[in-house]
Amino acid sequence: IANANMAAAIRLVTVAKGANPADYLLVAFGSAAPQHACSIARELGIRQVLIHPDAGILSAVGIGLADVVRHRSIGVELNLDQLSLSHVREQLDRLEREARGEVRREGVVPEQIVATRSLDLRYQGVDSYLTIPWPTDDDFTTAFAAAHRKQYGYLHQGRQLEIAAARVEVTGRVASELAPSKRATVSQPTSRGTVRVVFGGRMQDTPLYERTELTAGDRLVGPAIISEPMSTTVVEPGWHAEIFSGGELLLTDSGEHAAENVSYAVADPVFLEVFNNLLANIAAQMGVTLRNTASSVNVKERLDFSCAIFTADGRLVANAPHVPVHLGAMEETVRHIIAANPSLAPGDVVATNDPYAGGSHLPDITVVTPVHNAAGKVSFFTANRAHHAEIGGIAPGSMPPLSTNLAEEGVLIRNLRIVAGGESRLDELRSLLTGGAYPSRNVETNLADVSAQVAANRQGAIDLIALVERYTEPVVAAYMNHIQDAAEQKVRQALARLPAGAHTFTDYLETADGQSVPIAVRFTIHDSTSKHAATIDFTGTGPVVAGNLNANRAIVTAAVIYVLRLLVDEDIPLNHGVLRPIEIVLPECLLNPRPGATPETTPAVAGGNVETSQRVVDVLLGALGIAGASQGTMNNLLFGDTTFGYYETIGGGSGATADGPGASAVQVHMTNTRLTDPEILERRFPVRVRGFSVRRGSGGAGRNRGGDGTVRELEFLRPLTVSLITERRGPHPPYGAAGGEPGAFGRNRLIRADGTTVELPGIIQLSVEPGEVLIIETPGGGGFGKP
């Protein structure tokens, strides 16, 4: 388990840098690392491991031999051209002189001082940069293209490059050059005896060697143990070790490994944890790939996406810790795709954003990829869902506060095969995005992000195939089922700890026209050994509304899975097994509207995904009485014009529990996204961040206080359309539990250029002018227990 987790951490770091760990040699240092090195290297596909003669104290050795280094950098923010390069060169000349002076004052002679220069380059309109060493021919364009293609897998043809910053590193060489270590004539050392060691579940007699007695040229065949004063090296079966002239150990994988013999008829607790982590880490790597290759702020900076792995019949197995409202709903999407495409071929990829086929709302595009085995049969699916901040509709940002039907919310994508047999069909998606009554305002970014979603699924497929090659498909498939079984048992145990019987609760949504619409639940706990250990019945919930706070079964299911996951209070994945012991009763209502024949006659759902999902969590937790309500909203803010749309959600207070106070200024429950960095927000969009702070005292009083909300102030720099979808502005505050007081309502207001203040409702679309300031005060969380 430990080795698998360490390998996963290494893989995440290397994938984020666009590197394949299998292309490198693994250096093991520290007292324990050589014990794990062979296993970790094999997990990563690395064939060789290098162990320094002072591996156990290598960090201390390194400090003693370290060079004297000084770094200097300067912000540039200029387009890349000859004029800007000339300007940057002059600035770096000055910085280099300063740094060289500091290094000389450390006692390093000028002849031992070297300097290297680099530029932080990025495409115009993109926030992340790559650091490019200064080419001898000054051809940064070619060097950047090579680096970008290596890390991200694509280029933005024809887009202007800009210099974000310039850097110089001045190094004073202190340590003398070491002679290169070489192979020596092969010899066979004599062991000091044998010890009994378990490898691959089997006890083996293993030779024991003292490293101090090994000489250059000695070659050992694993399994073997090499002991030394500061460390111990384990040479696993299938590896051999040789000693170089400098005393280094080079371990090499012979490649003679059969698929691991893992018993799978019954779950082994160790391998259950191993596979759980392996699959979750594949999903996490998908997320890294998606973030790296995407173009939009919403994906790269706000991380508004989720990645997951599914069985051949579409059951959710594993996911990365992304956005709960995405993760719990994607299973229904994948199952709809399977039903509509029973014969997906290798190289096919399907996209959808249909809220009535497992989707959440139109900005959330889901990309689904089948993973075929060697016989051409679908074995698994990889899928991800990403929020596109612009997908068309009657308002920039594609979440119009006042939409009344699905057509007004953007472009509907239904079961579109965007890759067929490995051939891109994005032109069909382009035609869809540019057509219709309300086309997307930013088609190129849509296409770039969808391409990134395809790449993320491909990464997941590659990793799943590698997992099958290592363990065999029957083993992987069996442990996917075992993981779901384990999740089911954990949920049953959690439900058994709750009081039996029916627990009811009702809370309310506040619509744009001032209505209070109930969401009611009856959470009944049965015998934990029965087929359904609990029934969650939403009978009594209000009817379909004219606005866009309608949700769907997938969103409700996501909220239920999330709350069940909270009850377990252990680190288990959100997967299909969580729902097995649960019966969900969902009549036709605002949580389960009936679609119309066309988008124009289909109920709107833009706010249901973000706001109604939060209220469903509130009523479920309220029924159980285990926490005060959290802020109960995502505080959705959108602004834009005919050329762009921007979207963010704003954190607030979380509810207190019997165990402690609520957290302040956090995203809660069904969202897990970040805010865009102020520097990036101000550079990319016509807005200035005037303030962002904790709203002190907004959490509800109680034995444990609710968390405080936030105050966000934005000044607009040009005429824009602004949309707000923000619940808990009154008359229903975030409730307290067990006698705790409710959290404070949220509040929205606009400061006009002349200084007058306009109070704004929770759901509104308005026009703003340059110099006007929007202030959003988010709700606090409810308290727990009497104050």
Across the structure, where does each feature detected by a protein language model lie?
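C-terminal, non-catalytic interaction/recognition modules in large multi-subunit enzymes and RNPs
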Residues: 1-5, 9-21, 28-787
